[in-house]
Regions:
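Gly/Ser-rich "nucleophile elbow"/oxyanion-hole loop immediately N-terminal to the catalytic nucleophile
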Residues: 61-65, 115-123, 129-177, 187, ...
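Alpha/beta-hydrolase
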Residues: 71-73, 103, 199
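Active-site glycine-rich loops that stabilize anionic/oxyanionic intermediates
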Residues: 75-79
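Short, solvent-exposed loop/turn and secondary-structure capping segments
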Residues: 80-86, 111-115, 129-135, 184-185, ...
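Conserved alpha/beta-hydrolase
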Residues: 97-108
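Extracytoplasmic, non-cytosolic globular domains
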Residues: 183-201
Length: 232
């Protein structure tokens, strides 16, 4: 008890000091405040774009020598710009002089996310997926030269044609639905990528409908390696 009383007494004595420090911390500018925000460039006319995706990119200033290209795929209910910033991709591109291409899914207004009666109206609202998820579970969007997969491949080709990008150093990474689409891209275009990273995604070929996609995520699907190899 003596130790507890001493601890409480010490906290009381130093209360004013801690309050001053906290007030100073609240007044201090956030890290990076005042710096010019890094903006992504939206590109048009990069191909036939059968998947109806938006294309954003970031190219470090003064890039002259062939640079690596990283394809970054966001998760559901996310946007390319916020994912690139919050996940540190823009900082990585600046520090390593890597070029980024950031496909963005067309979802409905965030106000309508998860609203059941909106689902049948997604196409009429100009969206591909209600919650802005990449359609990794749709065969017409996740196969070689089909839909969203082909749109992403066209973005890569456009970046290689327009900027000093090393074709031998093209990488892809994605989170959640973006991770699942990353798996699809690696399976559909293995010759295109030097490597990839799947974060919280699912294996390619796990689902071909929305219902099966939900099963892949929970409770999950367990298959033998040879069964996954045969998935299409």
């Amino acid at each position: 008890m003596l130790s507890l009383r001493k601890t409480i007494a010490s906290l009381v004595r130093n209360r004013g000091r801690w309050e001053k420090l906290l007030r100073a911390a609240r007044r201090a500018p956030a890290p990076g405040a005042g710096a010019v925000p890094i903006r992504l460039q939206e590109a048009h006319g990069f191909g036939s774009n059968p998947g109806n995706l938006r294309m954003f990119s970031y190219v470090p200033a003064g890039l002259k020598t062939p640079a690596p290209l990283i394809v970054v795929l966001h998760g559901c209910k996310q946007r390319a710009a916020t994912f690139a910033r919050d996940a540190g991709w823009l900082d990585l591109a600046e520090s390593t002089k890597a070029v980024l291409v950031l496909p963005e899914q067309k979802g409905v207004n965030p106000f309508w996310y998860d609203v059941a009666w909106v689902a049948p109206l997604v196409g009429l609202l100009g969206a591909n997926n209600q919650n802005a998820c990449f359609n990794w579970f749709q065969p017409d969007d996740a196969a070689h030269d089909r839909g969203e997969a082909l749109s992403i491949a066209q973005m890569i080709a456009a970046m290689i044609a327009r900027y000093p990008v090393d074709p031998g150093r093209v990488y892809i990474a994605g989170l959640s639905a973006g991770g699942a689409m990353t798996a699809a891209m690696l399976a559909a275009y293995p010759e295109r990528f030097a490597g990839g990273a799947i974060v919280a995604g699912v294996p390619y070929g796990c689902a071909d409908t929305v219902i099966r996609a939900l099963d892949c995520m929970n409770p999950g699907v367990d298959r033998k390696p040879e069964e996954w190899r045969q998935a299409d």
